[in-house]
Amino acid sequence: AGQKPNPRTSDEQFLRRAYLAIVGRIPTIAETQAFLGSSADGKRDVLVERLLASEGRVLHEYAFWADLLRVQTRLADRYPGQNYIAWIKQSLRENKPYDTFVRELVTAQGPLLQRGNGATGFYIRDAGMPLDHMATVAQIFLGTQIGCAQCHDHPFDSLTRKQFYQFAAYTHGADSAKDLLGGKELRQRMKDKELPVEVKKMLQQFSNSVAMRVK
């Protein structure tokens, strides 16, 4: 009570703050001149809507999620991660609700390289490490550290070692190596040249890598 609101920001202040908050950069000279030179009513609302609809907003938010989800261009040091990256960016582009975004990640299944199925990269990222993956999931989405419960009951929480393994059992059946390429259907599409050039290139690189390991 008795507190007064801050005075209205100047156009210069608003412009800078809007760009930094929404797209993660300061405005260019041209953008600054265009905004400050406009006398249109509601130009601030128009600016915000334009920035929210821009690819810059997608890339700025992606930087946050890429860090949180530990995204890599090569998952588990051998699988191409571009499909996973594209899925995250498209989810942000569509302004996908948070609960839907998380649900699609934790319930992802199917071949990693299948078009539109990039959410499976969430599991491929920690291929062969189901316990570490579960600890990371809890840290990201529950905001709590449970990794110590892999070996013993949590010393500062009620979580037991048994409960940790019950959590981990949720993804026990996930096989990151099985049917990575989507089986016969995807290989046939590759043969019939129905896949984008960049996807075929990634598949070829993966096949070459496997061949080298076999030799």
Please provide the spans of the model-predicted regions.
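Short, structured secondary-structure elements
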Residues: A1-N208, M212-K215
